């Protein structure tokens, strides 16, 4: 069987109040269809954090996984950069 490519994204943790869960803000740049100006668009994704290692402000990498709950279908891979305290 062929290896399936796994979607990974990098973003900033905006909430870690839930147990074993984090909310990650993913920002991307798109061009306006008519005027061509570069615009920031953002998406908030819920991710599974098994060991509660990520804190607010951390830059993290998440990967797509099977649905874990109603809103969670992403899993924490690593903390790329810890937040300055």
Swiss-Prot record:
Q: Which Gene Ontology BP terms does the record give?
A: translation
Q: Which GO terms describe its molecular function?
A: rRNA binding; structural constituent of ribosome
What highest taxon heads this organism's lineage? Bacteria
Keyword terms of this UniProt record = Ribonucleoprotein, Ribosomal protein, RNA-binding, rRNA-binding
User: Which SUPFAM superfamilies does the entry link to?
Assistant: Nucleic acid-binding proteins (SSF50249)
Q: Under the cellular component aspect of Gene Ontology, which terms does the record hold? A: cytosolic small ribosomal subunit
Q: Which Gene3D superfamilies does this one have?
A: Nucleic acid-binding proteins
Q: Cross-referenced PROSITE patterns, in alphabetical order? A: RIBOSOMAL_S17
| Pfam families from the UniProt entry | Ribosomal_S17
Family per similarity comment: Belongs to the universal ribosomal protein uS17 family.
Q: How does it assemble?
A: Part of the 30S ribosomal subunit.
Record's function text? One of the primary rRNA binding proteins, it binds specifically to the 5'-end of 16S ribosomal RNA.
| HAMAP family from the UniProt entry | Ribosomal_uS17_B
Q: What is this protein called?
A: Small ribosomal subunit protein uS17
Species whose genome carries this gene: Acinetobacter baumannii (strain AB0057)
């Amino acid at each position: 069987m062929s290896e399936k490519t796994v979607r990974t994204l990098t973003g900033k943790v905006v909430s870690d109040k839930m147990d074993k869960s984090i909310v990650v803000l993913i920002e991307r740049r798109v061009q306006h269809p008519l005027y061509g100006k570069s615009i920031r668009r953002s998406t908030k994704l819920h991710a599974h954090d098994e060991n509660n290692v990520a804190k607010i402000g951390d830059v993290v990498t998440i990967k797509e996984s099977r649905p874990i709950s109603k809103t969670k279908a992403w899993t924490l891979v690593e903390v790329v950069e810890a937040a300055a305290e």
